[in-house]
Amino acid sequence: YHRVEERVPFSLEYFNKITNGGLPKKTLNVILAPPHGGKSLMMCNFAADFKAAGKNVLYITCEMAEEEIAKRIDANLLRVSMDDLMQMDKSSYDKKMNYLKSKTSGKLFIKEYPTAAANVNHFRTLVNELRLKKNFVPDVVFVDYLNICASSRMKMSGSINSYTYVQAIAQELRGFAQEFNIPVVTATQTTRGGSQSSDL
């Protein structure tokens, strides 16, 4: 317990304060939000910050298209709105992105899977392939998001309630984080009333 825990720091000091210095490796970190509560937006913001800080970021999306995730992360990196990003001409965009690339060594890889079709076995294969074929080793992995992944060891059926199924996915993601010695960030959906629960 005297060993210093290795962490991936946030760019925002507030998050470093509440996490004691950033995301610990080998952990599953879950953002809790109601439907349309900004789960993907927050994860894209964090992903952009980690990339800008020189970290290799793997963003796995089971909901939005790769292109939409890339747009959100680019807007965060360039510190512009989505509207401004879409109206930016190609030469201005290229100039800004080349400047960013010269300032940071962090890389970003985005992978899209069909909703409810991908599980940790797919993610494990992806990480291994990226390491072997592209020499890309992630420092942090984002999974967007927990409730719409699949379990690698449990089939969803009428006899299994959704809580048990999502719990199994969370356990598998935590094992994935431990296996690859990285923090995994995901999100889960709650009802608007559930976010006010005294259990949280």
Question: Model-flagged regions — what are they?
Answer:
Residues 24-29, 55:
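Pre-Walker A (Motif I) flank of P-loop NTPase domains
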Residues 42, 46, 69:
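Hydrophobic positions on the alpha1 helix immediately C-terminal to the Walker A/P-loop
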